[in-house]
């Protein structure tokens, strides 16, 4: 059994790493990819808000995570598709995320959970497909890690690798965000 203080440190560290990686990715990509930078910034803000729960209610923290998932992740994929000429997929992902963000109050907790995981997996798969066709190795890793985060969140287990499941998902999301930031940079270099 893992002690409660260790769980708190693990949770805080996973939020800090996700916030740090996402902030670095936002700053790195702001000049070349404003949509992706906005998506990374939403991830950063959601992770930081979760670190200071005394400033907000639990519902505010969940709302921030919801927005980072259903708007932030499609923003990340939007630019990846747009630059490769797949404008219809880019618009469909972003439009679907916006509709889900507005409909979040009507879905209920279970519906929001399923919709958030679906958005994560759809974004991961579409990034992976584009990365395979463009031979972007970082994009493949980013899509795979985002997919791992989505699949791990569906597991029934409370703990994975001696850590709380949510922490492992945040670590996978941070790794996917880092790889995706590198993929955007690689993609921009190929097009210039």
From Swiss-Prot:
Localization terms from the record: Membrane
UniProt keyword terms in alphabetical order: Membrane, Signal, Transmembrane, Transmembrane helix
Residue stretches spanning the membrane: 35-55, 63-83, 92-112, 114-134
Keyword Membrane: yes
Protein name: Transmembrane protein 276
Lineage: Eukaryota, Metazoa, Chordata, Craniata, Vertebrata
Membrane topology (UniProt): Multi-pass membrane protein
Leader sequence segment: 1-32
GO CC, any one term: membrane
